[in-house]
């Protein structure tokens, strides 16, 4: 796990990447030097956010004609902010594949590496992706890849348990397979287009893969989402989605695209926002709202956790 000074350095680097316009739009703290230019920054922020559609109709500025079909690919990058250092992931844009896993903290104990199963899943999946010849019409099957990676981890009697998400771009289809509360979302024209649904047994108890006492790969959600050029895919562990709402994520993605941020810059900004939300008291988050709904708690704060964010631009 990274030492606290390293984490602070990472967050400082992320902080420098966040434009003041994004800070205003998202309610983040402005840098001290930005106060004098607040009015101008606010104006820029408003102009960058997506325009609302008229009630009962589509945006009149949208063209009715479909763009000509062409081969799609992804440009992807990631950001990882460790807490217990139990998340792991890989990004392989040349193969059109990104994946992440979150080791279940409930296995944390002396002599037990709670991250072991997650790391085994991602290592096995990555090795198979690297060994697979790219260019097949159907692309890589995320469900088959998850199943193979799981079987290898079970055969090795790997300790721990893990949630996981694997995404693969095949033509104009983003194929997916996931288990548990690690999730992904697709944004189109500055708006949420698709969001995966968390698989949980009960509050804070997600579906998970393990050698024993876990769920089977057959429990994984799988399918495909039709994507097009300009779409943005954001995948993350629960450290992201427990602390950032879909609406907040939508605004960050829209602002990032309007400001021309790269996938890496967007991933950094999203992770930085999630970290700030996870450490801020007196602020409702998806985690606190769900806890209030399911357990009757009254706290208003985020959830400290590893935060993994993968951002892919469809181009």
From Swiss-Prot:
Gene Ontology MF terms: metal ion binding; protein serine/threonine phosphatase activity
Record keyword Magnesium present: yes
InterPro entries: PPM-type-like_dom_sf, PPM-type_phosphatase-like_dom, PPTC7
Domain PPM-type phosphatase: 71-314
Enzyme superclass (EC): hydrolase
Cofactor(s) of this protein: Mg(2+); Mn(2+)
Binding site for Mn(2+) 1: 102-103
The entry's keywords: Hydrolase, Magnesium, Manganese, Metal-binding, Protein phosphatase
Domain of life: Eukaryota
Enzyme Commission (EC) number: 3.1.3.16
Catalytic activity reported: O-phospho-L-seryl-[protein] + H2O = L-seryl-[protein] + phosphate; O-phospho-L-threonyl-[protein] + H2O = L-threonyl-[protein] + phosphate
List of residues binding Mn(2+) 2: 102, 238, 305
Cofactor annotation comment: Binds 2 magnesium or manganese ions per subunit.
Similarity field: Belongs to the PP2C family.
The protein's name in its UniProt record: Putative protein phosphatase 2C 24
Taxonomy of the source species: Eukaryota, Viridiplantae, Streptophyta, Embryophyta, Tracheophyta
